[in-house]
From Swiss-Prot:
Pathway: Isoprenoid biosynthesis; dimethylallyl diphosphate biosynthesis; dimethylallyl diphosphate from (2E)-4-hydroxy-3-methylbutenyl diphosphate: step 1/1; Isoprenoid biosynthesis; isopentenyl diphosphate biosynthesis via DXP pathway; isopentenyl diphosphate from 1-deoxy-D-xylulose 5-phosphate: step 6/6. Its EC number is 1.17.7.4. InterPro entries: LytB/IspH (IPR003451). GO terms for molecular function: 4 iron, 4 sulfur cluster binding; 4-hydroxy-3-methylbut-2-enyl diphosphate reductase activity; metal ion binding. This is 4-hydroxy-3-methylbut-2-enyl diphosphate reductase. It is an enzyme of class 1 (oxidoreductase). The gene is ispH. Catalyzes the conversion of 1-hydroxy-2-methyl-2-(E)-butenyl 4-diphosphate (HMBPP) into a mixture of isopentenyl diphosphate (IPP) and dimethylallyl diphosphate (DMAPP). Acts in the terminal step of the DOXP/MEP pathway for isoprenoid precursor biosynthesis. Binds 1 [4Fe-4S] cluster per subunit. The keyword Oxidoreductase applies. One of its GO terms (biological process) is isopentenyl diphosphate biosynthetic process, methylerythritol 4-phosphate pathway.
């Protein structure tokens, strides 16, 4: 302990960082590279995290946004669909091109797809609570015919969208939303439509719920709350909002320790720290080390749940063995 350093308590949230769906998606790309060799194409960022994407690029993954970007001479190479899910048109397009694809869609996102399709199969118009333009929303809307889904982003949308005549309604939601915001939208829908149908199971995933609850526990009284995550990560941005609502004096989203605005955050006593579901633990460690350079740091754990969940990869990749270094990367610690 150093006498000339100000004391800083870091409230470290648990759970934080990689969830089972993210872990599985990264593992699929690493396993595909091991089994088939580079390059392996990945449609969209496998998860929304620059560190992960750059690490996979170094191993031989090539990230694309459209199947047209795969050159003719590489049409026999594997292509992986991201954890966020894709519209039905994407695998159909891949099949039409005779591409070999591996679908890394999170099983909990696939569950929402099935819930939406069930609503539609039962003759209901589907309301999707989510954010326009997010890949998961694009993928879920793309499971159903054009016009079969209405996107609801706000309570205002819930109160004023024109419902189709003579059709029952059913709703699902994006898996990474704020629990409170989604509850308000659902409440508005249920007040407006007495017979609206809920999904058979909760759409917001366990990892989103757990990370938000941990932030709620750690944020009150924090001088600053940092969330490790990318600007395009929906669940990470929601954690910043949750921290602010729960009582943090200020909350920021950072991708690396280099983004910490040191000149703006002098004289901290309590720092809250969490990481979005696509952010690796190695960056959390990096941030703690950066604060330890300037402060006498003590770490206080704010653990609100355990996460034993594990999603297996597809059968085609189960015969591949990963090295310790591979597993460290997959688990976000290397």
């Amino acid at each position: 302990m150093s006498a000339d350093k100000q004391k800083l308590t870091i409230r470290l949230c648990g759970p934080r960082g990689f969830c089972a769906g993210v872990d599985r998606a990264i593992q699929i790309v690493v396993l595909a590279l091991k089994k088939y060799g580079p390059p392996v194409y990945v449609r969209h960022e496998i998860v929304h995290n620059r560190y992960v994407v750059e690490g996979l690029q170094q191993r031989g993954a090539i990230f694309i946004e459209d199947l047209d970007e795969i050159p003719e001479e590489h049409r026999e190479r594997p292509v992986v669909f991201s954890a966020h899910g894709v519209p039905k048109s994407v695998p159909a397009d891949a099949q039409a091109r005779n591409l070999f694809y591996l679908d890394a869609t999170c099983p909990l996102v696939s569950k929402v797809h099935k819930q939406a399709m069930r609503h539609q199969r039962l003759g209901r118009h589907v309301l999707l609570i989510g954010h326009a333009g997010h890949p998961e929303v694009i993928g879920t809307m793309g499971q159903l015919p054009h016009g079969a889904v209405t996107l609801i982003e706000t309570v205002e949308d819930a109160l004023h969208f024109p419902p189709p005549a003579g059709v029952e309604l059913g709703y699902v939601s994006q898996t990474t939303l704020s629990l409170e915001d989604t509850a308000e939208i659902i409440s508005a829908l249920e007040r407006r439509f007495d017979n609206i149908h809920a999904p058979a199971a909760e759409s917001i995933c366990y990892a989103t719920t757990n990370r938000q609850n941990a932030v709620k526990a750690a944020a009150p009284g924090s001088d600053l709350f940092l969330v490790v995550g990318a600007p395009n990560s929906s669940n990470s941005r929601r954690l910043v909002e949750v921290a602010e609502r729960a009582g943090a004096r200020r909350a920021l989203l950072v991708q690396r320790a280099s983004e910490i605005p040191w000149e703006e955050i002098a004289d901290l006593s309590v720092l809250g720290l969490s990481a979005g579901a696509s952010a690796p633990e190695i960056i959390v460690d990096e941030i703690i080390a950066a604060f330890a350079d300037s402060y006498d740091v003590s770490v206080e754990l704010a653990i609100t749940a355990e996460e034993p969940e594990n999603f297996p990869v597809m059968r085609a990749l189960r015969d591949v063995e990963l090295t310790k270094a591979d597993m460290a990367f997959v688990n976000g610690v290397g």
